[in-house]
Amino acid sequence: MSQDAVEATEELVEERERKSWVIDLRPLKVVAYRRMWVGNGVSFFGFQFTSVAVPVQMFAVTHSSAWVGLLGIAGLIPLLIFGLWGGAAADVVDRRKLLLASSTLAWLATVGLFVQALLGMRSGYLLLGLTALQSAGFAVSSPARQAIIPRLVPARLVPAANTLAYTTTTAGGVLGPLAAGLIFGLASTATGVTVAYLVDAALFTISFWATWKLPPIPPIEPEPGEERPTAGLSGIVNGLRFLVTQPVLLLSFAVDIIAMVFAMPRALFPEVAADRFGGGSAVGWLFSAIAIGSVIGGLTSGWIGRVKRQGVALVIAVVGWGVAIGFSGLVHQLWLMVLLLAVGGAADLVSAVYRQSILQVFAPDRMRGRLQGVFTVVVAGGPRLGDLRAGATADVTGITGSWAGGGFAAAGLAMVLAAAFPALLRYRPPAMAGNDEPIVSKP
């Protein structure tokens, strides 16, 4: 076969892949990205054991959803402090080394959770402290991890790489809580949380391996006249200055904050599982439901990259999330609650892919870490504020008022914001900028 025929065949295959509704797997051909994808997926599966165990243990110790909600604040404060700094550092140092160091901190926090559970400590304050330490490690590692992706794959495959990353982590979000729920259904709470923390600590080592095998990812030298990034306050301020000049980015962050703060019902899952469904494995289903929907949304995501009015699609996805969460708070059948939460999860996957891809299109590599730091604060901080809101309002209005009312409020506020500031509704993606060549992985 001639070279022209080979190239024509490859173009035909790519065209079919672009038109397919099935998830785009082309980024997995890049060895470095594939290793990182595997490592992140396995470690996120393990982290879900901890994400279920900590609120379950907190509720068992305190018998209060308000205390469970405080876990949101314990996770939020380090995110605010270290998320922005970690993003600035990712623009200054080798991102691989930064990811290794920050992941070690998060792993040590998980080991601490295992030790306190093994020793039978019953301290809500200790759980809050270890949650804060784990959040600090995540806050630094997340901007570096996300800023690495455009350095590993060609620019045209960045949206597909983001979709693969979200789908894989949410698949871990399905299997992890289900497995954790099975543990809690078969064992006592004390035994269940101990095993859950141990599983997380063990699986985290796969992520270390994947990060170690990454190639060096040093900062790209700025062009003459461009800013040389710093990890200090001035570097963070310069990143924020760039952000405020991009109204589409600001609005995309704002609708996400609304969606997560008002509609995230996660802090209510332990109480609802115990009171409505008798405890046991129900808590695993509730924690898995949103992720189940996200996986389904990811596996059928081939259409996402073909949408031209991505701002409109983002708003529709956020409204769909709020409405689905609102109705799920009104039902008393476990299967129907799981189904509605899954619909919300599919909508959340769509909005997450658009937000991340919009950000990576706007940001040059020299500012990508800092903007990913802001993204980390918004995306990870929003649900934690949502935990606090849900727990606090549940003690005042009851479970239904906190859960359903928050979901419908999020949908309404997102529509009002989009109508008041139509820049997001008018957004269409520009051509992807930047170097189209991937970094070659270590052998």
Question: What are the roles of these predicted feature ranges?
Answer:
Residues M1-P443:
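Alpha-helical transmembrane-bundle signature of multi-pass membrane transport and export proteins
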